[in-house]
């Protein structure tokens, strides 16, 4: 493979001898310890805005194609199989995977998706700015906010 004119801003460990490397146009999976070999390569045509890896899932957020859906979320497994392709109407600032769920947050709102792309929750969860969110299990989340810490539980 040629890596000329490519950016690789993020590499995640995916087990004892596997890695996920995010590039400006997609991601690649490498396996092996001494001389890792590329086993999967996924390329996207659209602009990738955010990426995350956890629980054997790769999540890419791309620029959407309309004002009604400013973003598009694609979910892949480590074999490169696309599991979901969802248009998003939620204006997010942060993407993370916690407790086997995809969390999109902005200043005061949270949007939760399953690792298969099904929306579980979307709404306001804070009166002040959310700085960090941590999954605590059983649909409970700890919010680190501008003015303190609070616990929320999603039904």
What positions do the PLM features span?
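Short loop/turn segments that connect beta-strands within the blades of beta-propeller domains
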Residues: 15-16, 22-25, 54-55, 69, ...
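Repeated scaffold domains used in trafficking and secretory/extracellular systems
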Residues: 3-17, 42-56, 87-100, 127-140
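C-terminal soluble interaction/assembly domains
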Residues: 75, 93-98, 103-115, 119-134
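Blade-level signature of beta-propeller repeat domains, shared across WD40, Kelch, NHL, RCC1
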Residues: 120, 126-155
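A short beta-strand motif characteristic of beta-propeller blades
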Residues: 1-3, 35-42, 79-86, 118-124
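C-terminal structural cap/anchor segments
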Residues: 39, 49-95
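Structural motif
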Residues: 24-31, 67-74, 109-113, 148-155
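Residue position within the beta-strands of beta-propeller blades
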Residues: 21, 60-61, 104, 142-143
């Amino acid at each position: 493979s040629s890596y000329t004119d490519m950016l690789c801003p993020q590499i995640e460990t995916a087990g004892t001898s596997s890695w996920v490397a995010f590039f400006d146009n997609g991601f690649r999976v490498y396996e092996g310890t001494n001389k890792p070999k590329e086993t999967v390569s996924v390329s996207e045509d659209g602009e990738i805005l955010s990426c995350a890896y956890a629980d054997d899932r790769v999540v890419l957020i791309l620029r959407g194609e309309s004002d009604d859906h400013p973003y598009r979320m694609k979910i892949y497994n480590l074999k490169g199989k696309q599991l979901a392709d969802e248009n998003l109407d939620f204006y997010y600032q942060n993407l993370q995977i916690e407790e086997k769920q995809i969390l999109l947050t902005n200043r005061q709102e949270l949007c939760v998706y399953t690792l298969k792309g099904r929306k579980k929750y979307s709404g306001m969860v804070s009166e002040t700015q959310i700085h960090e969110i941590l999954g605590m299990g059983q649909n409970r989340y700890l919010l680190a906010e501008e003015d303190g810490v609070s616990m929320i539980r999603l039904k």
